[in-house]
A protein has these predicted regions:
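Conserved beta-strand-loop-alpha-helix junction that forms the acyl-donor binding cleft
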Residues: 128-137, 156-160
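A short beta-loop-alpha structural element at the N-terminal edge
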Residues: 14-26
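A short, internal acetyl-CoA/4′-phosphopantetheine-binding micro-motif in the GNAT/acyltransferase core
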Residues: 95-102
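Conserved GNAT acetyl-CoA-binding A-motif
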Residues: 119-129
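Conserved beta-strand in the GNAT
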Residues: 65, 71-79
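Conserved GNAT-fold acetyl-CoA-binding loop/helix
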Residues: 27-52
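A short helix-loop-beta-strand connector motif used in the catalytic cores of GNAT acetyltransferases and
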Residues: 54-65
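Conserved active-site alpha-helix within GNAT-family acetyltransferase domains
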Residues: 108, 112, 132-150
């Protein structure tokens, strides 16, 4: 699909692979997303951790950033996963555009570059989560051909729960 099919590109961003020097901007975007998702206190990751985990010897994630006027204004952060049914996949952890730049086609540009990368890499699936109240995002994803699964539930265990579980099985 042409990119204007989803959101008109009013501002052309430069989309590139993130670099270690982008870590502060990445953290800023993560914090902004947490506020948007009504979880402002949930972010505990640090800039140093982003630098190590994304740009160290063994990166745990990769990221594309959108740059306008030498400012990082958006990102698509993802990491590889493996499906026992399909093979290699990517998980799109966050697709974020800073609030003043939303609705200008920057998210579409990031989404396009991420999916082109997935296509060129040969992954068998990409997946991500979207909050049920984020209707503009849901519409955007559905228009692009993504399927919103109603029958799978997201399951998580935070650090405290992991610690408690391990204590219980080892006592």
């Amino acid at each position: 699909y042409p990119s204007h099919y989803f959101c008109p590109i009013m501002i052309k961003a430069h989309i590139r692979k993130a670099q270690k020097s982008d870590a502060a901007s990445i953290l800023f975007l993560i914090r902004e997303l947490a506020i948007f998702e009504k979880e402002p206190r949930a972010v505990i990751v640090t800039q140093a951790q982003i630098e190590k985990d994304g740009f160290g010897d063994r990166p745990l994630f990769a990221c594309f950033v959108a740059v306008v006027d030498n400012q990082v204004v958006g990102m698509a952060l993802y990491y590889p996963r493996y499906s026992t049914w399909k093979g290699p996949t990517f998980h799109l952890e966050d697709l974020i555009v800073t609030e003043p730049m939303r609705g200008k086609g920057i998210g579409t540009q990031l989404y396009n570059v991420f999916l082109e990368h997935a296509y060129n890499t040969g992954v068998k699936r990409v997946e991500w989560a979207v909050l049920d109240w984020n209707l503009p995002a849901i519409k955007f994803y559905q228009k692009s051909g993504a399927t919103i699964s109603e029958d799978w539930r997201s399951v998580q265990m935070d650090k405290k729960s992991i610690d408690r579980y391990i204590l219980n099985i080892n006592s």
